Design a protein with these regions (language model features):
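Long, contiguous, secondary-structure-rich segments that constitute the structural scaffold
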Residues: 27-43, 47-134
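Long, low-complexity segments enriched in small/aliphatic residues
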Residues: 1-32
Length: 134
């Protein structure tokens, strides 16, 4: 067993996960679902947001060692102060996806490549990000 890395001060675990209104993120170009979904935001704990001067719907620059995105914030008590959350599957680059094109930001732009030694899957909780008001 190896001790996992921990975020340094000013860094946060980048978490991602599924959202209820989409099926495996293959339905994000569906106009009806798009109409009724909330816009993609990065969840930021209230205490962190206060320190950084961020309020809900402010644009936030999210930076990792491999990339950077800008998206709106959702300030909430519903996440730990050492974590941020982005719904994956957004930030499509294909202009053929006329509804989903350029909607939100892609978490893939931020994730570092870590392979879980047991399952061979990508270890998605070992990417750390920094936040600043954009």
């Amino acid at each position: 067993w190896e001790e996992p890395p921990y975020p340094k001060p000013g860094e946060y675990y980048l978490l991602t996960g599924k959202v209820g209104q989409h099926t495996q993120f293959a339905t994000q170009n569906n106009q009806l679902l798009h109409k009724y979904e909330d816009k993609p935001r990065i969840w930021v704990h209230t205490s962190v947001a206060k320190t950084l001067g961020i309020i809900t719907d402010d644009l936030v620059r999210v930076t990792s060692l491999v990339g950077e995105v800008i998206l709106a914030a959702l300030v909430t008590e519903g996440i730990r102060p050492d974590c941020v959350y982005m719904a994956p599957g957004y930030g499509h680059l294909s202009k053929g996806l006329v509804t989903a094109y350029a909607h939100g930001a892609s978490d893939s732009e931020l994730h570092m490549t870590f392979t879980d030694p047991i399952s061979g899957g990508q270890a998605l909780t070992q990417t750390f990000v920094q936040l600043e008001k954009a």
